From Swiss-Prot:
Keyword flag Transcription regulation: no
Protein name: Fimbrin
Phylogenetic placement of the source organism: Eukaryota, Fungi, Dikarya, Ascomycota, Taphrinomycotina
PANTHER family per UniProt: FI19014P1, FIMBRIN/PLASTIN
Region feature Actin-binding 2, mapped onto this chain: 369-614
Length: 614
């Protein structure tokens, strides 16, 4: 019966071919489920020499296997038919792979060398991992990597490699007996990936969701992977980790001015510091054209390790050959990573940046400071710094441009604040009244910046914010307390607007309403913990927020993993677990476990408000 149906659907196939295929399918379907998973299907066609990994993968897409990913007998024959005709899916030109998009009129391009180098990095850092170690090394020459990412485990592990403890891995759904996770469990893991990446800082998540990862959308996954790797590399370029970075200050530059520089600029400063020390006349201002001939790299490596890395590559006239010699020198320092000769010559900015950052992280080559030289860094304002970190992530999540890396400094001209108002309540801002940033890229004149900030304060007053004593000049001058007060009320308005749009009665929620909701969720889960306000000291153990999550989705909270929170370490374990569970639910959480344990009321409110919005 099935053979007749298939013969009608695929008249171009012989009866013998159809019978052979159905017989092959039945042998592969050892459990008699009536379907195969995609990895089994791909391997079957690869083993029988019917097509390469990428060809079979594209054929599966062409026969429109449903969202479950299950390949039924009819699909299996259809895949063979597509392979027999020839697959048109990808095209490679000069190291760039063009792939079909979601519709026939859309295509996307990915860089072949970037894919290869990022996969090599992942294979290296995940080797021996108890959960995914058996899945590496992943083939660097096929699209298998994107399929391996679908269940979120590889990406979760990569996030924790870049920024340790971002994800509490106890909340992840993991394979058992090598059986692939179902789509629902994959989406839960991918929620953790997306929402954790949003909270890492320095990562833009505006066009990728959990479903895109599940569907294996290559250009989106590769873009996310690059940002995660980049975040890990640049996160170590920090004066608190490397006080010797103080040596890079230029004449008449203050430490405060230096600390405002984004990490990429500090890397370029570091590169040029060594070139100058080597009496080399050239400088670098980018990670593309200025390094493409390999000369500056040759001098940098020689300066970092003269006994191992000579300047001999400068005598080589062929740039590709010189690039290879540069990387051979880097190999002597155990730093041949991310970059290839062709990527260097092509001036690939991502791979060059990764190479230089890795070089800095392993061989900074800066003399340690003695006691007299150590700079006086402002005392750490825990409350203010924690809030500034969360507010930075929140503002960046609104897709403001340029993105913020130095909270107080980046808000001084008022433009980001005004963009945020317009994102929260569209058409609030009359842009004709706003002073634009100079086209030259220079800093806006102070009086114009103050005018913008005055406008931002006025808009806040119109929204009923409490801004007594706050003027635009306070924002322009970088007043920490007053800037935080304004941005907090903007974020609070954003939370209440979101909840207002979701509530049936359309009621604007007060803090006490949110506290009551949290208490009701904790009670619903059968737990007795309650709080009086977002300042309640009992929040510090982390147990209350877990009880709230248990009330929302009881199966997500395993109380065997919950401690009494009696010590700071145990409380942080609880808080970290709660944050990852919230992200698994789909909540966008920007705070750190320490914010819950320290009972920072504004940040606890953000946590509860984000749960209410799920």
């Amino acid at each position: 019966m099935l053979a007749l149906k298939l013969q009608k659907k695929y008249p171009e196939l012989t009866n013998e071919e159809i019978l052979t295929l159905t017989d092959q399918f039945n042998k592969l379907d050892v459990d008699g489920k009536g379907y195969l998973d995609q990895p089994t299907t791909i391997k079957a066609f690869e083993d029988s020499k019917k097509g390469s990994y990428d060809e079979v993968r594209e054929a599966i897409r062409e026969v429109n296997v449903d969202s479950s990913g299950r390949v039924e007998p009819e699909d299996f024959v259809g895949i063979f038919n597509v392979l027999k005709k020839g697959v048109e899916g990808t095209e490679v030109k000069k190291g760039r792979i063009t792939i079909k998009g979601s519709s026939s009129s859309v295509s996307h391009t990915i860089n072949e060398e970037e894919r290869r180098e990022f996969i090599k990095h992942i294979n290296s850092v995940l080797a021996g991992d108890p959960d995914v170690g058996s899945r590496v090394p992943i083939n660097t020459e096929t699209f298998e990597f994107f399929d391996q990412c679908k269940d979120g485990l590889i990406l979760s592990k990569l996030i924790n490699d870049s920024v340790p403890d971002t994800i509490d891995e106890r909340v992840l759904n993991k394979q058992r007996n090598n059986k692939p996770l179902d789509n629902f469990k994959c989406i839960e893991n991918n929620n953790v990936v997306i929402n954790s990446a949003k909270a890492m800082g320095g990562i833009s998540i505006t066009n990728i969701g959990a479903g895109d990862i599940l569907e294996g959308r290559e250009h989106l996954i590769l873009g996310l992977v690059w940002q995660i790797i980049r975040r890990g590399l640049l996160g170590k370029i920090d004066i608190t980790l490397h006080p010797e970075l103080y040596r890079l200050l230029e004449e008449d530059e203050t430490l405060d001015q230096f600390l405002r520089l984004p990490p990429e600029k500090i890397l370029l400063r570091w590169f040029n510091y060594h070139l100058k020390a080597a009496n080399w006349p050239r400088t670098v201002s980018n990670f593309s054209k200025d390094v493409s001939d390999g000369e500056n790299y040759t001098v940098l490596l020689n300066q970092l390790a003269p006994e191992l890395c000579s300047r001999a590559p400068l005598q080589t006239t062929d740039v590709l050959q010189r690039a290879e010699q540069v990387l051979q020198n880097a190999e002597k320092l155990d730093c041949r990573k991310y970059l290839t000769p062709t990527a260097m010559v092509a001036g690939n900015p991502k791979l060059n940046l990764a190479f230089v950052a890795h070089l800095f992280n392993t061989h900074p080559g800066l003399e340690p400071l003695n006691e007299e030289e150590k700079p006086e860094i402002e005392p750490f304002d825990a409350e203010g710094e924690r809030e500034a970190r969360v507010f930075t992530l929140w503002l960046n999540s609104l897709d403001v441009t340029p993105s913020i890396h130095d909270f107080f400094n980046n808000l001084r001209d008022g433009l980001i604040l005004l963009q945020a108002y317009d994102k929260i309540t569209p058409n609030t801002v009359n842009w004709k009244k706003v002073n634009k940033a100079p086209a030259s890229g220079d800093e806006m004149m102070r009086f114009k910046a103050v005018e913008n900030c005055n406008y931002a304060v006025d808009l806040g007053k119109n929204q009923g914010f409490s801004l007594v004593g706050i003027q635009g000049a306070d924002i322009t001058d970088g007043s920490r307390t007053l800037t935080l007060a304004l941005v907090w009320q903007m974020m609070r308005m954003n939370i209440t607007k979101t909840l207002h749009s979701l509530s049936r009665g359309g009621k604007t929620l007060s803090d006490s309403d949110m506290v009551a909701w949290a208490n009701s969720m904790a009670a619903k889960g059968g737990k007795g913990s309650q709080i009086r306000s977002f300042r309640d000291p009992s929040i510090s153990t982390g147990v209350f927020v877990l009880d709230v999550l248990h009330g929302i989705k009881s199966e997500y909270v395993d109380y065997n993993l919950v401690t009494d929170g009696s010590t700071e370490e145990l409380a942080i374990q609880n808080a970290r677990l709660a944050i990852s569970i919230a992200r698994k639910l789909g909540a966008v959480i920007f705070i750190l476990p320490e914010d819950i344990v320290a009972v920072r009321p504004r940040l606890v409110l953000h946590f509860i408000g984000s749960l209410m919005a799920v």
